[in-house]
């Protein structure tokens, strides 16, 4: 079975070697047919602490690394991000 790959935005980079990535998807409402945004947050492994808040990244499913981490960051998608750091 191939590994799942998702694209999302880094919403937190405060922890060591971990980033939180928010992945949004669009679903159609069952009754009304309206397109709705749904999102989910994933904890992903970032070995070198190189990804910052606001960047768009691609994450890949891996074997569990901890209680929450089962994903790792594989690449940066958007290099023109605007980080929220002061």
Swiss-Prot record:
SUPFAM superfamilies: Nucleic acid-binding proteins (SSF50249)
Paired cysteines (S-S): none
Listed GO MF terms: rRNA binding; structural constituent of ribosome
One GO CC annotation: cytosolic small ribosomal subunit
Transmembrane regions: none
InterPro entries to which the protein is assigned, alphabetical: NA-bd_OB-fold, Ribosomal_uS17, Ribosomal_uS17_bact/chlr
Domain of life of the organism encoding this protein: Bacteria
Alphabetically ordered keywords of this record: Ribonucleoprotein, Ribosomal protein, RNA-binding, rRNA-binding
Pfam family of the protein (one): Ribosomal_S17
GO terms under biological process: translation
Keyword Ion transport: no
Function text: One of the primary rRNA binding proteins, it binds specifically to the 5'-end of 16S ribosomal RNA.
Record text on subunit structure and interactions: Part of the 30S ribosomal subunit.
Protein family according to the UniProt entry: Belongs to the universal ribosomal protein uS17 family.
Name of the featured protein: Small ribosomal subunit protein uS17
The encoding gene: rpsQ
């Amino acid at each position: 079975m191939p590994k799942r790959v998702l694209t999302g935005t880094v919403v937190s980079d405060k922890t060591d070697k971990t980033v939180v990535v928010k992945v949004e998807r669009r679903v159609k409402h069952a009754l009304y047919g309206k397109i709705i945004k749904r999102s989910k947050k994933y904890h992903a492994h970032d070995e070198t602490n190189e990804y910052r808040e606001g960047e768009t990244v691609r994450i890949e499913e891996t074997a569990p690394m901890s209680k929450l981490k089962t994903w790792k960051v594989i690449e940066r998608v958007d290099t023109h991000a605007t980080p929220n750091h002061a």
